[in-house]
Amino acid sequence: MEKIGVLLMNLGGPERITDVGPFLYNLFSDPEIIRLPVPAFQKPLAWLISTLRSTTSQQAYLSIGGGSPIRRITEQQARELQSKLRDKGLNVTTYIAMRYWHPFTESAIADMKADGIDQIVVLPLYPHFSISTSGSSFRELKKLRDSDSDFKKIPMRCVRSWFSQSGYLKSMVELISEQISLCESPADAHIFFTAHGVPKSYVEEAGDPYKEQIEDCSLLIINELEKYLGHSNSYTLSYQSRVGPVEWLKPYTEEVLTDLGKAKVNDLIVVPISFVGEHIETLQEIDIEYKEIAEKAGIVNFRRVKALNTHPTFIEGLSDLVVSSLNGPVVNIEKASELPEKVKLYPQEKWQWGWNNSSEVWNGRVAMIVFLILFIELISGSGPLHKLGIL
């Protein structure tokens, strides 16, 4: 029987406090996370940002137990998906490829080759495609595949995005309805979708379909929820987790929470729409930071919907995605990672000197100024970073 490998791609996260700095360095070294007009500045800037943010990030991870649970949860998802697919008669082994922390993609590739896998299905654990999530993972996989003749011989099928898949929608509805049922007046509960944000330029300049897919997904869930409950609920979509001075997708989660408080919303059902497992953005950012903002704004009941994790309906939905990929037309790695032809993948390639409104140009200028300041301080041995104890 053909040996099938299912490669689950995810972000990764630091498992111990000492991992936080290196994890952040890997994250910000990715040009899809911070895109600069001068590639040579990428790693120095990544080092600087990871150094400056490390202490704050460590405190955030300490507040949720000292590390990210994303690897443990992804491994659980992989085991249950493997079991489900084997129950369906498929000779499947699941593998995990994390983008920014262990186990890295290289490790998964080595394991698949050692196991003699005959065909690979690549399934990103991101329902919605974005340059900075699935896109980055697909391009990393493509780079490694192109440099490995043996790996390149193994047939590969990719699932690009799956936010409209019935099992995913059903599992979201089931988890949301659990929280709505706790409300004194379920029909009056306000559904609050919060998705991980991306810089606005990714959508407007690079053609990232993420915003459109998030909006479509929110509406699909609301429609399915109404059928399931027999009544409609008002809803709002916002974006969280922005970093840096550039403009990200709006509205921002913290601002919307304040507005909902002013609107006298009592029962708020918070739905982390772009996260399929618990990690720092759900356990710390939503459960601690945003809950505090909501309570200060006057929201009485802040009910956060659990992440999908290993919810049975969700695992069933993932297995259906794999089966559909195997039985449907081949989507290769080139097709999975491409963007619309009318746009360029890296808008910063258009960068020119001169003042304009492009946030990515501002990113580049800021990076160059910061790098120059850092270089001078390293040479001189004195400056603000030394006074702060960072250098």
Curated annotation (Swiss-Prot):
Sequence similarity: Belongs to the ferrochelatase family.
EC number annotated for this UniProt entry: 4.98.1.1
Gene that this sequence comes from: hemH
Metal-binding is among the record's keywords: yes
Cellular compartment(s): Cytoplasm
The name this protein goes by in its record: Ferrochelatase
Any GO MF annotation of the entry: ferrochelatase activity
Major localization class: cytoplasm
Catalytic activity: heme b + 2 H(+) = protoporphyrin IX + Fe(2+)
HAMAP family xref list: Ferrochelatase (MF_00323)
Pathway where this protein functions: Porphyrin-containing compound metabolism; protoheme biosynthesis; protoheme from protoporphyrin-IX: step 1/1
PANTHER family: FERROCHELATASE, FERROCHELATASE, MITOCHONDRIAL
Keywords: Cytoplasm, Heme biosynthesis, Iron, Lyase, Metal-binding, Porphyrin biosynthesis
